């Protein structure tokens, strides 16, 4: 475990890396005693600093939702990060590549909460009843720490959350079987990745349930209007300057952004 001073130093490192768009040395290397509790405390510290500076908390993201990713990270559960309003990107937007260190994109579904949801004891049905609608999303992920990261680094770095674009057609959570929502990620008109939403813990709503229970253990709830990225169901696609990324969700429409 780290001291409070070391946790604040870690937050300083992450914020400096984001400001300078230059990856820092892994926190797990600089602070070998770091524990997962430290990592969540660090990500919370960074989020609180940004909120104090004027940003607004609008939701959360869930990561590491596939068994393969959990095994590679040597954990047995997902992780989460905070979504702030300054991370939102319009569908069709031109995004400055220079604003990121090494941006990548993922295909996801976003749940917008209609009712307050707080764990423990939240299950799939609870999530579906509390959700106002579900909408396609592209998440931009951007690690502020160098490669060979450990789970402690990923969690402290807010799950690499960097940007979110919503688009396509919103649907009610009970209108379709969300497991069968498919996503195709194109880069410059070529298919790079495909996936099914069932890849998120068997059902994307289970990613939201896990989050509600995790936050409930911390004394926090998902509030009405909050956005939850339930977890990626594709592998990441690296984005270079000049690339156009288009996520096709079939009957639910699509989203596109361009890095300039």
Language-model features: where?
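Active-site proximal loops enriched in glycine and acidic residues that flank catalytic Cys/His/Asp
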Residues: 231-232, 249, 259
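Short, charged beta-turn/beta-strand-edge "cap" motif at the junction between a beta-strand
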Residues: 233-237, 251-254
């Amino acid at each position: 475990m780290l001291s409070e001073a070391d946790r604040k130093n870690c937050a300083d490192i992450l914020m400096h890396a984001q400001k300078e768009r230059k990856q820092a040395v892994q926190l797990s290397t600089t602070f070998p005693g770091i524990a997962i509790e430290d990592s969540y405390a660090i990500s919370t510290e960074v989020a609180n600093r940004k909120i104090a500076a004027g940003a607004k908390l609008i939701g959360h993201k869930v990561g590491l939702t596939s068994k393969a990713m959990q095994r590679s990270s040597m954990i047995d559960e997902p992780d989460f990060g905070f979504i702030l309003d300054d991370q939102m990107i319009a569908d069709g937007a031109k995004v400055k590549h220079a604003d990121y260190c090494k941006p990548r994109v993922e295909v996801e579904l976003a749940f917008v909460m209609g009712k307050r949801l707080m764990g423990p004891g939240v299950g799939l049905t609870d999530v579906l009843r509390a959700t106002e609608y579900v909408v396609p999303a592209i998440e931009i992920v951007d690690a502020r720490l160098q490669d060979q990261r450990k789970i402690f680094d990923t969690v402290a770095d807010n799950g690499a959350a960097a940007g979110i674009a919503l688009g396509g057609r919103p649907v009610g959570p009970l209108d379709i079987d969300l497991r069968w929502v498919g996503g195709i990620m194109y880069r410059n008109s070529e298919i790079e990745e495909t996936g099914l939403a069932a890849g998120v813990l068997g059902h994307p709503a289970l990613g939201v349930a896990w989050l509600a229970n995790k936050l409930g253990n911390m004394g926090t709830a998902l509030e009405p209007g909050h956005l939850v990225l339930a977890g990626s169901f594709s592998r990441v696609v690296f984005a270079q300057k000049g690339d156009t990324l288009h996520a096709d969700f079939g009957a639910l429409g699509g989203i596109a952004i361009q890095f300039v």
